[in-house]
Amino acid sequence: MPKKRAEYRLAPAAARDLEGIWLYTLEEWGIEQAHRYTDELTAAFDQLANNPQLGTSCDYIRKGYRRSRVGRHAIYFRITDYGIAVIRLLHDRMDAPRHL
């Protein structure tokens, strides 16, 4: 029997973050770049779900959380029994401990 593919699920805050990133990118750089960047982020979610150890531990911020960078954003996530739970997508200028 083939191995079941892991999945990712976005927390409500992460879904709002992704929408905000898309809207900001649309306003600043246009629709093509907005699609390209959010596609890059969602591809990273899929990759992390199937290989969560690619993300680095950030227990010093919040126990059990891991982080991976895409462009100017950090994906904060937890490993789950189904893959990963994406908690937040934070710009590198944001204070992660305050927003997590």
Question: Where are the regions a protein language model picked out?
Answer:
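Short, hydrophobic secondary-structure boundary micro-motifs
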Residues: 34, 56-58, 98
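Enriched for short, Lys/Arg-rich terminal
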Residues: 73-100
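Short proline/glycine- and basic residue-enriched helix-capping loop/turn segments at helix->loop/beta transitions
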Residues: 46-50
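Arg/Lys-rich, positively charged N-terminal/basic patches that mediate binding to nucleic acids
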Residues: 1-36
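Basic/aromatic recognition patch in beta-strand/loop cores that engages polyanionic ligands
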Residues: 53-82
